[in-house]
């Protein structure tokens, strides 16, 4: 199974649509996913904004719609966009670090599986040449894209957002479970969210 999927991932797909179809048909992690594979992602070649989160939760696995949950509601509020804009693939691409629901662990969902990034992420990014801003939501996305440039904590990384601009903007995960973090770091919504909204507005309206 893994060998076959690795071969498929090595294929050069003529269009983004064919690549997305191949990703959605991927079964590389079948044996490790409690509810089976259902890759959830979306992208259009003209998108200027890329949203990179963790992995779909149970509700998103059920609906097949990314960020179709309370976390998504808060994220859209941060961005200052409604659902019509958020789900407009010509403006915003949504590619998590893990494309399928990974199941539950102690205290929350399991981490995103690494196979997705290994097999597909580089190809997907290469098919999105117009991306100007990538939102790195949570430490899995920040670890992958920022590497050693990350700070010691997520809060420090978010505070240092200007070091990663204009290409990246590191954000905490908007999950309701992170409410204590938001209360402890009230500067985030006061200082960083307005900057985020201004960038999103400028790019989404082009």
PLM regions with names:
Residues 2-204:
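A polyanion-binding, active-site-adjacent surface
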């Amino acid at each position: 199974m893994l060998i076959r999927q690795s071969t498929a991932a090595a294929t050069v797909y003529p269009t983004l649509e064919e690549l997305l179809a191949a990703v959605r048909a991927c079964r590389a992690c079948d044996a490790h996913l409690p509810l089976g594979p259902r890759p959830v992602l979306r992208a259009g070649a003209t998108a200027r904004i890329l949203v990179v989160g963790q992995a779909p939760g149970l509700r998103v696995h059920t609906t097949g719609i990314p960020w179709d949950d309370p976390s998504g509601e808060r994220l859209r509020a941060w961005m200052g966009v409604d659902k019509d804009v958020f789900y407009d693939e010509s403006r915003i691409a949504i590619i998590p670090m893990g494309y399928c629901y990974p199941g539950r662990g102690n205290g929350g969902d399991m981490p995103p599986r690494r196979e997705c990034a290994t097999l597909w992420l580089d190809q997907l990014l290469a098919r999105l040449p117009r991306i100007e801003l990538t939102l790195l939501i949570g430490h899995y996305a920040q670890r992958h894209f920022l590497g050693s440039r990350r700070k010691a904590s997520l809060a420090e990384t978010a505070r240092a957002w200007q070091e990663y601009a204009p290409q990246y903007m590191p954000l905490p995960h908007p999950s309701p479970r992170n409410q204590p973090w938001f209360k402890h770091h009230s500067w985030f919504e006061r200082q960083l969210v307005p900057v985020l909204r201004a960038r999103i507005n400028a790019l989404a309206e082009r």
